Amino acid sequence: MLQKVLTIAGSDTSGGAGIQADLKTFQELNVYGMTALTTIVTMSPEQWQHQVFPIGLDVLESQLKTAFSVGIDALKTGMLGSVDVIELAASYIDKHDMKRIVIDPVMVCKGENEVLHPETADALREVLIKRALVVTPNLFEASQLAKSTPIKTLDDMKEAAAAIYEKGAKYVLIKGGKQLEHEKAVDLLYDGKNYCLFEAEKVDTTFNHGAGCTYAAAIAAELAKGRTVEDAVGLAKQFISKAVRHGFRLNDFVGPVMHAAHRRF
């Protein structure tokens, strides 16, 4: 029987990120995906400006009731968007004693510079992170969660990971990607004692829309199969590295990663 994974996240109408990226990842990795929508994100055809439409809490809770009644082997969160949504998600995690939880602390839409809801950083930090098996911030998100200066080096990553770990996550995975001052695309996994590096060749591309969502979804999929966190991250790193390497142009504004790259190339 297929393992079941729930994503609590936003819908990206362009199909590259959010629950669309999650479901594509789940399908590619042979797990059964379910969704609970928190927001719908659209983009203007003229300049690709983002608009975020929140889903009502009552509608979100109805979705959660449905998904949890089916049974869930792992859970992943993406764009939650408000303190109320974070608290609702946390209540369902507690009620159903979920253990395999991947928190992708989404704070911005790709292409946007502003934090969507600045107050969500505090709620993510104080309410949700302590419930995570793995939390997967990028460099910007990690600096926000750790309340640190911008992260530029591997030592900066280690300091931020330790600060985030103190908030209660079992594992902290900071994604260095191509932004870190390092010869390779490096991600750092910290379990409170040991630092483990996951490396891949850097890819000079802007066609990486949905990379963070896809990476976290791949980790959740592998955890659902019973893999250790280290093995799940290693397999997910291989999956996302190939997906980024074969990212493609969707239109004049955006290019997503290719979820099928692991079997096509």
What are these model-predicted stretches?
Residues 2-7, 27-110, 114:
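Conserved N-terminal subdomain of the carbohydrate kinase-like
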Residues 8-14, 195-209:
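Short pre-catalytic strand/loop immediately N-terminal to key active-site residues, enriched for Gly-Thr
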Residues 15-32:
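N-terminal basic/disordered segments at the start of proteins
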Residues 20, 144, 206-229:
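Short, small-residue alpha-helix embedded
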Residues 29-34, 196, 222-235:
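Phosphate-handling active-site elements
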Residues 118-194:
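Conserved phosphate/ATP/ADP-binding segment of small-molecule kinases
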Residues 230-265:
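Charged C-terminal helix
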